[in-house]
């Protein structure tokens, strides 16, 4: 075991003896301050609540501690710079897009809030995406300005220069700038409800990523639903280890705590060692909420197996986790039962499973009460969410489907004769997105004629809860909590000079959920190793989309219509 981990045990051992693991109290917050910002608008974004939490600690990162007042003041200052640069009238960008690339720290929150304060739509970029993918998002979103932390200026400068988009560097004042007393009403009162708030890019069955545009009402609906369901309070402290370009990291793990005045401890990179140290540390603020994808839990357990080998250390770890941490959540990918069971043995926690996607935020969640959680189930609808399980029925005129079950937070009604019958999940409610950016036809086709969003996921209702059976489309691969479009990967791989044909499939994997596998046909006389393919693909694909397996074949089988039967490919190459 590492020396400093042992030291942590010794220090916590003393704490254990003295406090007997009494639940930690939140540090004193002093006087709370309020400001009359957008009181009349029930869809106002999270920053309008910040001054009410005043000098409470909002974030802890590698730069230090940041209060709500500090984040607000720095965001306001940055929003004014954005408006000056863009020449917006009356301090309102009127939904112009603001792309930003920041580290997992306070700079991200400041950039997000500043985008909203200036009346813009926030477009978060992912720091591990290659330049070509960043260029695609900035171009497709038609961003008016790009914000970037100092460490990403070199990466983004040639991209924005090529696109002709102004670049606004974020200075160190983002972290340490003096706090100015904000005006009584610092941002223009505006109708937030239907105003565009954020575009998150998600992979789809059509290939290139689509921009999912959510309104402030959409985001508020997700946040308030989760705050209610998971009993968030100002005394919570969450450890944040997730990427900040999808709903799990942005909404669930960041906006929820900031909504209630809680504290978010942000790690710049996921590190199993540092996560365990944070769990076991007696320093304040003390972690009591954690959210991750199944792959992260697997990595944590692998570290545990290597370093927590002594029975007394294992007992101590379990005692601390049981007494100090109130909620642990898994999402973004199916949670393998062995992972759930082993995590419970290690920490005493039965992971709460939930279901959502970029277009709908969160729709289903397991119960907060651990005793009634069913392993493998994603629970029941969140407040405000309506769901249906349906199957196609083209003979019906009013709507082209048959309803198996329909429910909301109050309960689910099953159609007689359709008990425990699988079907596609449809979702409706205030959390459902406004549109795919600049894609009206794809937006239209994503909904039924009567206005329900088609998730493309196969589900079943049984034992009083909902169970996800998998994607209706084999062209969506969920790996390590990320959603990868097989078609987009194929599109890029076909540009390789040695490849003539390719099929990308998702193969079941205990660690990653699915792994990206490329079935490839090469040009005559060419050769290609997996290592060579990975090195080439890293220049055009996100790290998680680079194929982790290469299968070379003389010909990829297709049907009479020229289509590839990917389910048959998976069965052929991976029969287990």
UniProtKB/Swiss-Prot annotation:
<dbReference type="InterPro" id="IPR000873">
    <property type="entry name" value="AMP-dep_synth/lig_dom"/>
</dbReference>
<protein>
    <recommendedName>
        <fullName>Malonate--CoA ligase ACSF3, mitochondrial</fullName>
        <ecNumber>6.2.1.76</ecNumber>
    </recommendedName>
</protein>
<dbReference type="GO" id="GO:0006631">
    <property type="term" value="P:fatty acid metabolic process"/>
</dbReference>
<dbReference type="GO" id="GO:0031957">
    <property type="term" value="F:very long-chain fatty acid-CoA ligase activity"/>
</dbReference>
<feature type="transit peptide" description="Mitochondrion">
    <location>
        <begin position="1"/>
        <end position="83"/>
    </location>
</feature>
<dbReference type="GO" id="GO:0005739">
    <property type="term" value="C:mitochondrion"/>
</dbReference>
<feature type="binding site">
    <location>
        <position position="457"/>
    </location>
    <ligand>
        <name>ATP</name>
    </ligand>
</feature>
<dbReference type="Pfam" id="PF13193">
    <property type="entry name" value="AMP-binding_C"/>
</dbReference>
<dbReference type="GO" id="GO:0090410">
    <property type="term" value="P:malonate catabolic process"/>
</dbReference>
<dbReference type="GO" id="GO:0016878">
    <property type="term" value="F:acid-thiol ligase activity"/>
</dbReference>
<dbReference type="GO" id="GO:0016405">
    <property type="term" value="F:CoA-ligase activity"/>
</dbReference>
<feature type="binding site">
    <location>
        <position position="471"/>
    </location>
    <ligand>
        <name>ATP</name>
    </ligand>
</feature>
<feature type="binding site">
    <location>
        <begin position="202"/>
        <end position="210"/>
    </location>
    <ligand>
        <name>ATP</name>
    </ligand>
</feature>
<dbReference type="InterPro" id="IPR042099">
    <property type="entry name" value="ANL_N_sf"/>
</dbReference>
<dbReference type="InterPro" id="IPR020845">
    <property type="entry name" value="AMP-binding_CS"/>
</dbReference>
<feature type="binding site">
    <location>
        <position position="563"/>
    </location>
    <ligand>
        <name>ATP</name>
    </ligand>
</feature>
<dbReference type="InterPro" id="IPR025110">
    <property type="entry name" value="AMP-bd_C"/>
</dbReference>
<comment type="function">
    <text>Catalyzes the initial reaction in intramitochondrial fatty acid synthesis, by activating malonate and methylmalonate, but not acetate, into their respective CoA thioester. May have some preference toward very-long-chain substrates.</text>
</comment>
<dbReference type="GO" id="GO:0090409">
    <property type="term" value="F:malonyl-CoA synthetase activity"/>
</dbReference>
<keyword id="KW-0067">ATP-binding</keyword>
<keyword id="KW-0443">Lipid metabolism</keyword>
<dbReference type="GO" id="GO:0035338">
    <property type="term" value="P:long-chain fatty-acyl-CoA biosynthetic process"/>
</dbReference>
<keyword id="KW-0547">Nucleotide-binding</keyword>
<keyword id="KW-0436">Ligase</keyword>
<keyword id="KW-0809">Transit peptide</keyword>
<dbReference type="GO" id="GO:0006633">
    <property type="term" value="P:fatty acid biosynthetic process"/>
</dbReference>
<keyword id="KW-0276">Fatty acid metabolism</keyword>
<comment type="similarity">
    <text>Belongs to the ATP-dependent AMP-binding enzyme family.</text>
</comment>
<dbReference type="InterPro" id="IPR045851">
    <property type="entry name" value="AMP-bd_C_sf"/>
</dbReference>
<dbReference type="GO" id="GO:0005759">
    <property type="term" value="C:mitochondrial matrix"/>
</dbReference>
<dbReference type="Pfam" id="PF00501">
    <property type="entry name" value="AMP-binding"/>
</dbReference>
<dbReference type="GO" id="GO:0005524">
    <property type="term" value="F:ATP binding"/>
</dbReference>
<keyword id="KW-0496">Mitochondrion</keyword>
């Amino acid at each position: 075991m590492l020396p400093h981990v042992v030291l942590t045990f010794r220090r916590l051992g003393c704490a254990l003896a003295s406090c007997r693991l009494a639940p930690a109290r939140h540090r004193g917050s002093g006087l709370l301050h309020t400001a009359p910002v957008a009181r009349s608008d029930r869809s106002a974004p999270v920053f309008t609540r910040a001054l009410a939490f005043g000098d409470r600690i909002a974030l802890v990162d590698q730069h230090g501690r940041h209060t709500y007042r500090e984040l607000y003041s720095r965001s306001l200052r940055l929003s004014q710079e954005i408006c000056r640069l863009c020449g917006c009238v009356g301090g309102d960008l009127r939904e112009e897009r603001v792309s930003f690339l920041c580290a997992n720290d306070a700079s991200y929150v400041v950039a997000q809030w500043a985008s909203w304060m200036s009346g813009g739509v926030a477009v978060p970029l992912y720091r591990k995406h290659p330049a070509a993918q960043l260029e695609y998002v900035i171009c497709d979103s038609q961003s008016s300005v790009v914000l970037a932390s100092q460490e990403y200026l070199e990466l983004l400068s040639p991209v924005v220069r090529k696109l002709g988009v102004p670049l606004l560097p974020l200075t160190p004042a983002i972290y340490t700038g003096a706090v100015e007393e904000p005006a009584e009403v610092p941002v223009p009162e505006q109708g937030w409800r239907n105003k565009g708030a954020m575009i998150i890019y998600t992979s789809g069955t059509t290939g290139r990523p689509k921009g999912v545009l959510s309104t402030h009402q959409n985001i508020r609906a997700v946040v308030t639903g989760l705050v209610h369901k998971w009993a968030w309070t100002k005394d919570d402290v969450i450890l944040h280890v997730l990427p900040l370009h999808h709903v799990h990291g942005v909404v669930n793990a960041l906006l929820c705590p900031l909504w209630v005045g809680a504290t978010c401890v942000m790690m710049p990179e996921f590190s199993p060692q540092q996560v365990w140290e944070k769990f076991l540390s007696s320093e304040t603020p003390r972690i009591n909420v954690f959210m991750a994808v199944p792959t992260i839990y697997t990595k944590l357990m692998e570290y545990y197996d290597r370093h927590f080998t002594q029975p007394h250390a294992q007992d101590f770890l379990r005692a601390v986790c049981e007494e100090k941490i109130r909620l642990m959540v898994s999402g973004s990918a199916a949670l393998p039962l062995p992972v759930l069971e082993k995590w419970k043995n290690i920490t005493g926690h039965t992971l709460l499973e939930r279901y959502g996607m970029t277009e709908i935020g969160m729709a289903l969640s397991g119960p907060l009460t651990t005793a009634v959680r069913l392993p493998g189930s994603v629970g029941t609808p969140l407040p405000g969410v309506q769901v249906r399980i349906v199957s196609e029925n083209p003979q019906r005129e009013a709507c082209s489907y048959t309803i198996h079950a329909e429910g909301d937070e109050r309960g689910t009604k099953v159609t007689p004769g359709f008990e425990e019958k699988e079907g596609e999940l449809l979702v409706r409610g205030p959390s459902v997105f406004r549109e795919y950016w600049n894609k009206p036809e794809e937006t239209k086709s994503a909904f039924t004629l009567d206005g329900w969003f088609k998730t493309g996921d196969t589900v079943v209702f049984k034992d009083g809860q909902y169970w996800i059976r998998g994607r209706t489309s084999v062209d969506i691969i969920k790996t390590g909590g990320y959603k990868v479009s097989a078609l987009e990967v194929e599109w890029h791989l076909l540009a390789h000079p040695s490849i003539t044909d390719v099929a990308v499939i998702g193969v079941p994997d205990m660690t990653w959920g699915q792994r990206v596998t490329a079935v490839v046909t090469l040009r005559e006389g060419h050769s290609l190793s997996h290592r060579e393919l990975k090195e080439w693909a890293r220049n055009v694909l996100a790290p998680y989309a680079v194929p982790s397996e290469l299968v070379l074949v003389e010909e990829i089988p297709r049907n009479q219509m020229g289509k590839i039967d990917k389910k048959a490919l998976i069965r052929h190459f991976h029969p287990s």
